[in-house]
UniProtKB/Swiss-Prot annotation:
The lineage of its organism: Eukaryota, Metazoa, Chordata, Craniata, Vertebrata. This is Beta-defensin 104. It comes from the Eukaryota. Residues 1-22 form the signal peptide. Induction: Antimicrobial activity is decreased when the sodium chloride concentration is increased. Pfam families: Defensin_beta_2 (PF13841). Disulfide bonds join C30-C57, C37-C51, C41-C58. It is found in: Secreted. Keywords: Antibiotic, Antimicrobial, Defensin, Disulfide bond, Secreted, Signal.
Amino acid sequence: MQRLVLLLAISLLLYQDLPVRSEFELDRICGYGTARCRKKCRSQEYRIGRCPNTYACCLRKWDESLLNRTKP
């Protein structure tokens, strides 16, 4: 009976899709959750610093039209 419970517990743990991520992974979140770590920032992004993996921390540029909206 104990083996059955152990087998069931192990199978449930293996069934879950746990994300395995490296500390030095590309597209890691940086900048207080607002930016991404990349080897090179894209054309629509600003470089705001460095990530722990020495890649650039890239923040997406704001759309000017969204910042100047006024409600009627």
